[in-house]
Amino acid sequence: MQQVYVYDAVRTPFAKLGGGLAKVRPDDLAANVIQAMVERYPNLDQSKIDEVVFGNANGAGEENRNVARMASLLAGLPTSVPGLTVNRLCASSLDAAIHASYSIGSGDNNLVLTGGTESMSRAPYVVPKPERAYPAGSSQMVSTTLGWRLINPKMPEEWTVSLGEATEQLVDKYQVSRERQDEYAVLSHQRAHAAWEAGHFDNLVVPVGDAKRDETIRPESTVETLSNLRTVFRKENGTVTAGNASPMNDGAAAVLLGSEQASQTLGADPLVRIASRGVAANEPQYFGEAPVPAANLALERAGITWDQVGAIELNEAFAAQVLVNLDSWGIELNDERVNAWGGAIALGHPLGASGSRVLGTLARRLKAENRRWGVAALCVGVGQGVAMVVENEDATE
């Protein structure tokens, strides 16, 4: 197997539900980041891009089933460049990078443009077809924005609870306090705001129309203000609120992967090397636990320990999930290695794009902070976790 590298990363701003990107189709969001990426390499023969692999969690509407191919064509790439869409819900675009890394590692491909896209604002309603023609009754219309839809009745009820209720069950299991959740959420907003002010996103985020900045960062948040918010999923003894959970968003992100030889194709040096990957699963209702075994597996495969990791990008679906993960790894809530530029609670979580956002940010952070080892990890609805370990080979730490 040959080595695989991350060469570059871009993303759109992440807009709030019904916000600045609500009128932009998900295939156009993806086309925007594809165009932005290839424009950085004006001398690149675009036919040398072996494949476009994108993640998407919905796929029920304007994604038109295979959004990677649609976006590739919309972006003006040669028709000879294939497109593949993968779906592992929230980790879809990290899985896109994993798929691409295997194809490059095997020698089948040299340069693959990966990414993810999601428009939660434009997710359609679906109506199941009747079992017989001309029914007299009514059909149920189901939103595809988030969570379960058209559940198979053979599924055990405890597996099919909402993501929020599942998180409350995680809180019960691990006794995560509301105060700790709110404290972590405030930290996410503060770090995201500071990262924007410091210019960390200047070379990472590309505008789409009038949308130029992430829309859900609230640096004025405090533990006191968050403590006044109502719980969403349990009226009594609940802890999960709109303040300590990720919002619903629209956005897209892209990560360019290649072999060592791709450096000559691009005329650029890589950011980081992909060292290992890990995927794990557990009981569906405890989806928030799954990044723990996934990341542990990736670390084992890379031959390193948590003490050697200098940067961690852990997707913040819920503050409670983050705290359960960090506690399991023996990492403090305010550890500077974790989501130093903010996380999904502040930046946003456009499902299929978040894996690329996490990986791209991790690669940039390792370079900016002169750290060698980094871990990217995401939880996935229905009890899965995905992780990747990368190495900044130029680090002097």
Q: Where do the PLM segments sit?
A:
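Condensing-enzyme catalytic core mediating Claisen C-C bond formation in acyl metabolism
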Residues: 1-24, 146, 224-289, 293, ...
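Active-site pocket-lining segment
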Residues: 165-168, 201-204, 211, 275-346
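Active-site-proximal alpha-helical scaffold in enzymes
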Residues: 88-118, 171-200, 254-261, 327, ...
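Conserved catalytic cysteine-centered active-site region
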Residues: 24, 56-112, 144-145, 158-162, ...
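Short, well-ordered amphipathic alpha-helical segments that serve as non-catalytic structural scaffolds
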Residues: 27-41, 67-71, 96, 163-170, ...
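N-terminal extracellular/periplasmic Venus flytrap/periplasmic-binding protein-like
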Residues: 11-12, 23-32, 43, 180-265, ...
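Conserved beta-ketoacyl condensing-enzyme motif
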Residues: 22-112, 117-135, 205-214, 285, ...
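Flexible glycine-/small-residue-enriched beta->alpha junction loops
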Residues: 111-169
